[in-house]
Structure formats: C-alpha cells, structure tokens
C-alpha cells in the first residue's frame, strides 16, 4: 500500500537535465501582488514569441525588504521562479538573453524586479532601473575595497558601468590583469 505522499514524493533527480547539448536556467521575477495577473498576461505573449522552453513555474510570496541595498522586494511581492531549458550554443544563449530582457522589461513596467543574477543578461540600464540603490551599493564597495581585490563578473558588468566607477582615473583591474 502507498500513501498519496509517497506517490507524489519523487526526488528532484527525476527533473535533472541529462542532455549534454542543453542546460536548464532559473529565472526569478518579483512583481507587486496587485500586478501579478498583468505580468502573467505579458509572459503569455513573450515566452511563445521568443520560443522559450518553460519547464516549471513556482510562485512564492516575498515580504518587503527594508535592510539591503539591492533589495528585490520594495513592498510585498509575488515571485515567479521559472525553469527554462536552452541549447548550449551561441544561438541558444542569444535567444535566452533576448527572452530575459523582454521579461525584465515586463516586470519593470509593473514596478517589479528580476533576481540578481542567474545570468548577466540584464542591460546596465535595466539593472539600475530595477535596483535604484545600486550606485550607493557600488560606492560602498569601492570605499571598503579601493584596490578592487574582490570582484566578479557581476561587478565588472554593473559596477564598473556605474557612474563614478572610473573616479580619479582609477580603473579596477580585471582579475586576469592582477598579479598574485
């Protein structure tokens, strides 16, 4: 005899992508609760138009974050966590980038934001629109790390693009340029 919980309790390994020519990509978008239906309507247009291979969606409630600079919840939000499959090719990556940017624009148009980041697909303009305290965050980062010891691709794309990141002619070295 089996209980319903036993029958419905499959391990996550059954969802694991075992195809060498594709990969699964998580996206997460945060939208004010009152606009979730409009956001879903926009996604119903965008995803098929961009031929997105959506595998799964999880919805969760997010409380307001008043503590962090890069907050994704400026008020109560609903988050859509979406799992997409994409080809591991330059074309697959370009398609996912285009899809992502359109979904970010849809979230932004409703006062929402995107999660930071699973992929660096957001333009610097989209990033700064979604995270208005980013400039202050990057200023603090440079204040506490003036030599640029701690860097990653996120910082190189969005922090160096930030106004004032080239202060006094100082450009932080990319990791490959630094001697150890």
Please identify what each model-predicted range represents.
Residues 13-14, 108-180:
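Activity-critical C-terminal alpha-helical subdomain
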